[in-house]
Amino acid sequence: ALANGGFVVSWSSWAQDGQNYGVFTRLFDSSGNAVSGDVQVNTTTSGYQDHSSIAAMDDGGFAVVWTSDSGQDGDGSGIFLRLFDSSASAITAEIQVNSYTTGAQSDANVTVLDNGNLLVSWTSDNQDGSEGGV
């Protein structure tokens, strides 16, 4: 739930961003009424942008992480983050989260820690010597 009692949902949608899969969000009030239209999260539209996760922040905004399968991290798929305010307006550009870029990084999750920092986890092919380390 968001600080105002509402909530936000995210999904991947085919061709809604003009290409393949893109990530979108929508805000709802505490009664379940939509209070925003579809908000595009990803600005990179090549390849697939999907598998999103959302975390509500204390200031009423939210963070979205997702997998970008566009090669924008230099090799394969990478993990990207974007922050939004309480009205679903973006307050950051896309931020690459993963520093290890060989192969595929995918299946990201995000949570807010007690101190307000974000913790992002994901699986990474071969980074720890196995195919799917976290």
Predicted region positions:
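Extracellular, repeat-based ectodomains that mediate carbohydrate processing or recognition
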Residues: A1-V134
